[in-house]
């Protein structure tokens, strides 16, 4: 629900978001898309140009102004990753009843940056903030690797030693690369008792404004938890959390924008 008196701000945001994806748009194109009153739209566009949010070229087309970049850089400069992740992770852990982790890359390892336990989850001392993890045996590691470029993947595969921990551990680099490709295609990673027996983990990547993956989140539980169709419900909770954090880091998905409509 839009707060009273905020219509102009909401309209400005929709115009900026639209132009961000199409590159530039004319007055008539914006009028046809949003169906705003003619005079109101023209006045709003003029104000946005005066403030630096839009640039109008000699052909009458509007594009994004440098003001958006300046404000975005200031916001990111002052951003604390934990301010963005804390609430979504708390909600994920509470709704799932499982342990939730935030992880990142450190050299050729993954590292836990945060850990949130649900009141319903079994307390565990097997994971802690600051713990380093081998990339090939963890869902977090796979999620962090799967969205790397092929050149980056070649580097990591050359540097990694695929040490076996259970009979499910990937020890063949060709098979591990295939697993990373499957992970990217389906959008999520799994550690199916590959690091330790009795523990299964799901993970999804977190994207930043440059469509890069620097972080990943995960849910950990025992194999029984994920039995049957339960895995789908956990993946949906995980997806919503990852999207919320990605959005907070400046990521914008074009398809998401198109679904919003006017």
Swiss-Prot record:
SMART domains: HTH_ICLR. Residues 81-251 form the IclR-ED domain. Residues 27-46 bind DNA. It comes from the Bacteria. Residues 6-66 form the HTH iclR-type domain. Keywords: DNA-binding, Transcription, Transcription regulation. GO terms for biological process: negative regulation of DNA-templated transcription. InterPro entries: GAF-like_dom_sf, HTH_MetabolicPath_Reg, Tscrpt_reg_IclR_C, Tscrpt_reg_IclR_N, WH-like_DNA-bd_sf, WH_DNA-bd_sf. GO terms for molecular function: DNA binding; DNA-binding transcription factor activity. This is Uncharacterized HTH-type transcriptional regulator YjhI.
């Amino acid at each position: 629900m839009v707060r009273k008196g905020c219509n102009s701000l909401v309209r400005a945001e929709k115009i900026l978001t639209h132009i961000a994806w199409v590159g530039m748009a004319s007055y008539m194109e914006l009028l046809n898309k949003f169906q705003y009153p003619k005079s109101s739209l023209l006045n709003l566009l003029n104000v946005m140009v005066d403030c630096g949010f839009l640039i109008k070229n000699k052909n009458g087309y509007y594009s994004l102004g440098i003001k958006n970049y300046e404000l975005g850089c200031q916001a990111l400069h002052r951003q604390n990753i934990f301010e963005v992740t804390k609430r979504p992770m708390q909600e994920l852990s509470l709704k799932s009843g499982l342990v939730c982790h935030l992880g990142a890359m450190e050299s050729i390892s993954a590292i836990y940056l945060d850990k949130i336990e649900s009141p319903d989850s079994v307390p565990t001392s097997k994971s802690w903030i600051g713990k380093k993890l081998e990339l090939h045996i963890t869902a977090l590691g796979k999620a962090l690797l799967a969205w790397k470029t092929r050149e980056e993947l070649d580097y990591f595969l050359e540097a990694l030693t695929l040490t076996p921990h259970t009979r499910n551990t990937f020890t063949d680099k060709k098979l591990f690369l295939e697993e990373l490709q499957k992970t990217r295609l389906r959008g999520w990673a799994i550690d199916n008792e590959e690091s330790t027996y009795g523990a299964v983990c799901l993970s999804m990547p977190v994207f930043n404004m440059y469509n890069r993956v620097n972080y990943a989140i995960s849910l950990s539980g025992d194999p029984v938890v994920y039995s049957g169709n339960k895995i789908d419900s956990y993946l949906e909770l995980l997806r919503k959390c990852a999207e919320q954090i990605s959005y907070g880091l400046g990521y914008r998905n074009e398809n998401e924008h198109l679904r919003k409509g006017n």
